[in-house]
């Protein structure tokens, strides 16, 4: 009986070890989770939110990120703009299928004086290739502080 209990405990531990925070999240909830990880400057969580490879199209310039070795965001540069945190104004799921989704995020950058110093819209193409939602592509129509 003790061996059986130990076996089930081991199985549970292994199952939990391979779980991802975004398991069971909807596309909208993933974007909320992403912004929280961004505001916390939680690089490991941000690396889990993004699929690799992924692309960013910022102001018409395409950048491909093949591995986690390339920083996903420039927090040093972002803080130089006075950034304190990013606020979600609105999230719209524009399209959602079984394994892909398109999400529009209207957001603001808030500075140390708690003032909105930048407002923008970003579009996220999400994939569920690994069984949970991840960002495959980020696109903005203009330059966004802190986004490479």
Feature-to-residue mapping (PLM):
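Beta-sandwich strand segments
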Residues: 115-117
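Surface-exposed, charged secondary-structure patches
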Residues: 72-113
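A mature extracytoplasmic/lumenal domain signature
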Residues: 50, 60-61, 105-109, 122, ...
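Hydrophobic pocket/interface hotspot
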Residues: 34, 46-47, 54, 103, ...
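Sec-exported extracytoplasmic/periplasmic mature domains
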Residues: 35-40, 51, 55, 76-80
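Short, low-complexity N-terminal intrinsically disordered segments enriched in polar/charged residues
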Residues: 4, 8-48
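A short gly/proline-enriched turn/hairpin at secondary-structure junctions
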Residues: 55-65, 81
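Short beta-strand edge/turn micro-motifs at domain boundaries
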Residues: 119-148
């Amino acid at each position: 009986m003790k061996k059986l209990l130990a076996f089930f405990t081991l199985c549970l531990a292994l199952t939990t070890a391979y779980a991802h925070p975004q398991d069971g999240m909807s596309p909208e909830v993933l974007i909320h989770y992403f912004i929280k990880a961004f505001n916390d400057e939680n690089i490991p969580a941000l690396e889990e939110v993004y699929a690799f490879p992924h692309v960013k199209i910022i102001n018409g310039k395409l950048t491909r990120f093949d591995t986690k070795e390339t920083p996903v965001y420039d927090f040093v540069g972002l803080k130089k703009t006075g950034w304190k945190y990013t606020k979600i104004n609105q999230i719209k799921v524009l399209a959602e299928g079984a394994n892909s989704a398109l999400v529009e995020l209207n957001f603001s950058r808030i500075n140390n004086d708690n003032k909105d110093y930048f407002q923008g819209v970003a579009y996220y193409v999400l994939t569920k290739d690994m069984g949970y939602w991840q960002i495959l592509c980020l696109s903005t129509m203009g330059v966004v502080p802190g986004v490479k």
